[in-house]
Regions:
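Conserved phosphate/metal-binding and DNA-contacting active-site motifs used
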Residues: 1-203
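N-terminal structured subdomain of primase-like DNA metabolism proteins
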Residues: 191-225
Length: 225
């Protein structure tokens, strides 16, 4: 059985991967633009492959994956919470999702949608060592995702060969839900004084700012403000 040919027939581009989940090709960019040929699929299957990755994005019919990572050891907890909220609010949406479990006990929610984008980090947190990890991220245009039947991967619901399309609104619901698990907000730089806010590096001088402000006030006065 050649999974690469089956994926091709389902309109999904794919790549062979090694045990470290890395592509077993010098380049796979061409597979972001077209499906592999039957001949290429045969080569992939005979390439001493370890597993299979699906190429996300337009080439695969706007395939996108929500990846619940287990780096922080809480993937199952997050996954169960997400599933509960989807089934309680959008059971029809839940039934459309292909769901798989990864070798490191992470989870993938797989779907197609008219609207997708590049990969995004939806929920992050900082661990005890101060390192920032993404608990939930997407695999979109320009990315790939390792899937079943790669060793160690399990199919929980449905088959990726029959992946369904969800609506744009349903995708937004999923994203909002995932964003609610975010525990890390990137700190934005704060200016300690006015002079720092208008530094020479920024291309603004304090004098220039005052001149522009005074010019603006003069204009307002001319118009009886």
């Amino acid at each position: 059985e050649n999974i690469f040919i089956k994926l091709r027939e389902a309109g999904i581009s794919s790549i062979p991967v090694n045990s470290e989940k890395k592509p077993m090709l010098e380049t796979w960019k061409f597979l972001q633009e077209r499906l592999p040929s039957v001949e290429e699929c045969e080569k992939f299957n005979n390439k001493n492959k370890y597993g299979v990755g699906v190429v996300c994005g337009a080439v695969s019919g706007n395939l996108e994956v929500i990846d619940i990572d287990n780096k922080n050891g809480i993937a199952t907890e997050i996954f169960e919470d997400i599933c509960k909220q989807i089934t309680n609010n959008r059971i029809d949406l839940f039934d459309k999702l292909v769901i798989e479990k990864s070798i490191r006990n992470g989870y993938h929610l797989i779907y197609r949608c008219d609207k997708i984008e590049g990969s995004r980090k939806l929920a992050r947190q900082k661990n005890e060592d101060g390192e920032i990890f993404a608990d939930i991220e997407t695999r979109g245009e320009g990315s790939y995702c390792v899937v079943y039947p790669t060793p160690g991967y399990e199919r929980i619901q449905k088959n990726i060969l029959k992946v369904e399309k969800i609506t744009v609104e349903e995708r937004e619901f999923l994203f909002d839900l995932c964003l609610s698990f975010n525990k890390y907000v990137e700190e934005k730089p704060t200016f300690t004084n006015f002079k720092q806010a208008f530094s020479e590096k920024s291309g603004d001088r304090i004098g220039d700012f005052y001149n522009e402000r005074n010019d603006f006030i003069d204009i307002l006065k001319k118009h009886d403000w």
